[in-house]
């Protein structure tokens, strides 16, 4: 009696909302919450905004191209398989290992950033404990089923999105003088000193590298395509929504920070070379608004 062996199939449980939040949650993190202050301090509000817009345009073309490939050929092997199939085996091999190395370094960076963030609230606890705890959480989430992973990512990414929306609302109120905050110069910061473009072309290029790091994670749609429901339908929808939402979040946040905090603010300059979460532009702005507890 012969046995027929069925090849293992991935369970396609990820919908458009999961893909949206996986990409948004992967790209919105320390690049915005911590590094955005350094971009304004180094290149001024105009330079930082221009750098994010330029990188955003580049990401748009990258994402639309990836979306076409993932829609035509959804695969569980991540997007480096497209390099193997459509270019050459060595190209796909190098792309795959570079991508692995990229995220291995990023995860380590994020675990270190967790120490600095948690130290703001729990200064007496060793940072190693927080890194170990969050590493266990990351491992646990990745060990879940596809549906469980998708729902977990949706929830955690939603928290990030809500935090940014609250930040944007408070920032708009401060710019419009609905929330009166002493010492906030608003649009005068765009013409102060060397502003809006500080440091010239070299500063713009340097900040563009930080902006590129910040957008990392948008490509997650290509990684998750092999486990998405009806990829021919969900991938194009997710690609269109993800790019504009992420670009909107970054551009609006950079504009608000550059408008409300001067590029030569001593605290912002310290944030450019400090590991103290208290110097995050988000924390500084909340303190100016009188909501230090929200930081």
Where are the language model's segments positioned?
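Membrane-interface "cap" regions at the ends of multi-pass membrane proteins
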Residues: 1-37, 41-46, 59-64, 76, ...
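Hydrophobic transmembrane alpha-helices that form the core helical bundles
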Residues: 38, 50-51, 59-143, 148, ...
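Juxtamembrane interface elements at the cytosolic ends of transmembrane helices
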Residues: 36, 66, 211-235
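Select transmembrane alpha-helical segments in multipass membrane proteins
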Residues: 13-23, 88-101, 134, 197-209, ...
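Membrane-interface loop-to-helix entry segments
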Residues: 115, 128-187, 215-216, 239-247
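Juxtamembrane helix-boundary/capping and inter-helix hinge elements in multi-pass membrane proteins
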Residues: 43-45, 72-77, 85-91, 226-234, ...
